[in-house]
Structure formats: C-alpha cells, structure tokens
C-alpha cells in the first residue's frame, strides 16, 4: 500500500497544502491502494526529500517527493491521467498546471502569508497552538522568498488584477464543460480545483477571496472536482 505523507487539514480543507490535496486526488484517480499519514513533527518534516510535503512512501520505504514527482511515479505504474486528450490538449494541460502551480500558488502565498488578514487566519488555523517565535521566524523566510520571486513587490491592486486575469483565463478554458478538458477529470483538475478552493475562502486574505468568489462558475467546478474526489477521499482525523 502507498502512503501519502501530508500536511493536516481542517475547516473543510482536505489539507491546508494545496499540493497535498493535488497528490491525494492523483492517488484517487490512479486506482492505487493508499492511505493518508499526517506529518506534524518538524523534525520528521526536515527528513523529507526537499524538506517539504507531499511525499509518497511505497511498500519498500522509498520516498517519492513533490506532487509532480508523485504523478510521474504513478504514471510509471500504469496510471493514465489524461486519457482521451489529444497531443495539443495535453500540451495545454501541462501549461495550465504550470500556471496554477507557479502563478496562482504565489497569489495564494501572498494572500495567506503577506497580507495581515490572511496571516491572522493562518495563526488561527494552520499554526494554532504553535509557539509564535518559530512561526514568525518561518514567516520571515517565506516573505523573503516571495520578495525574491518579485510577486510580493507588486502592490495589492496589481496582484489582484493578475489574479482576476488568471481566473478569467481558467474560466474561459472551462467553458460549459464539467471539467477542464471535458466530461472526465484529468491531471489539470487535480491541480486547479484545490488552488481555486484555497483562494476562495479563509485563511486567504479577504481581498483575494472577494476576487475569487466573483467567479461562480469556477466555484461550482471546484465543488464537482472535490465531490468526485471525495467519494473515498480520506478525511483529516
């Protein structure tokens, strides 16, 4: 049996890490027998490849890190996440996943870590009960990273404008389809739905939530993806 090592969840989130939720959806789609194991100990997290989650542990104890690494691992075992897609659609899917995982993710990081309202929500949820000093030190490192990417150097209005542009682009791709590339879930849905869900409610800052909530078609889409995934999706203890 495969084991997904993941950050915990709560408040309706399978995990507060959207990449962990992505990995869980990929595991569900793969048909593999798997289980969830939450990682709470910082020392255990430090021993993970890349010192981050998600990570899958296989029956031999081998650790497979990163949501895209997990996808490749599952594909090597026979999983087919983009069945029925043309070569062009597969290229579009790959580009969309990169936009979500790298552009929308930066929006989410700013909405949770940079904005004071978002950070207050993080302290009440993700870091509830954790001593403030190490958490604040960790936040400072995250903010340094966001500054290095350049994203946090934009003012709020510019960030929100870019968020609106990205969400509008995804909404255009979705159209009137059930999922992004038709009537069946594909790999792109596993990335996109959890990220939009995270931007649509706390602990994301209210300004980002407001922009995301204006896209009702995307919110309905997120519900479809999560409902399909949740048929047997493990829940946080």
Feature map (PLM): residue ranges:
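Non-transmembrane alpha-helical segments in soluble domains
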Residues: 71, 75, 94-97, 101, ...
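GST-like fold's C-terminal all-alpha helical module
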Residues: 105-219
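Short, hydrophobic secondary-structure boundary micro-motifs
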Residues: 16, 83, 180-183, 208, ...
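A general structural signal marking secondary-structure boundaries and capping sites
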Residues: 78, 174-177, 229
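GST-like domain detector, emphasizing the conserved glutathione-binding G-site
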Residues: 1-132
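Acidic carboxylate-rich catalytic motifs and surrounding loops in phosphoryl-/glycosyl-chemistry enzymes
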Residues: 37-43, 185, 235-237
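Alpha-helical oligomerization segments
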Residues: 223-237
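Amphipathic alpha-helical segments that form well-ordered structural scaffolds
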Residues: 22, 26-29, 162-173, 224
């Amino acid at each position: 049996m495969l084991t997904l090592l993941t950050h915990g969840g709560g408040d309706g989130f399978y995990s507060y890490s959207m990449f962990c939720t992505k990995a869980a959806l990929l595991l569900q789609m793969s048909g593999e027998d798997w289980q969830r194991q939450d990682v709470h100990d910082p020392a255990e997290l430090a021993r993970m490849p890349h010192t981050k989650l998600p990570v899958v542990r296989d029956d031999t104890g081998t650790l497979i890190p990163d949501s895209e690494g997990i996808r490749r691992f599952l594909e090597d075992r026979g999983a087919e996440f983009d069945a029925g897609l043309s070569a062009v659609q597969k290229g579009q899917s790959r580009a969309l996943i990169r936009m979500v995982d790298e552009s929308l993710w930066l929006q989410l990081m700013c909405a949770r870590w940079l904005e004071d309202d978002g950070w207050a929500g993080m302290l009440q949820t993700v870091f509830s009960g954790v001593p403030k000093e190490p958490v604040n030190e960790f936040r400072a490192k995250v903010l340094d990273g966001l500054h290095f990417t350049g994203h946090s150097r934009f003012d709020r209005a510019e960030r929100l404008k870019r968020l609106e542009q990205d969400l509008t682009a995804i909404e255009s791709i979705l159209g009137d389809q059930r999922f992004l590339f038709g009537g069946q879930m594909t790999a792109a849905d596993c990335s996109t739905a959890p990220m939009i869900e995270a931007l649509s409610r706390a602990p994301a800052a209210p300004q980002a939530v407001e922009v995301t909530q204006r896209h009702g078609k995307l919110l309905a889409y997120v519900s479809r993806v999560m409902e399909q995934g949740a048929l047997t999706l493990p829940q946080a203890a």
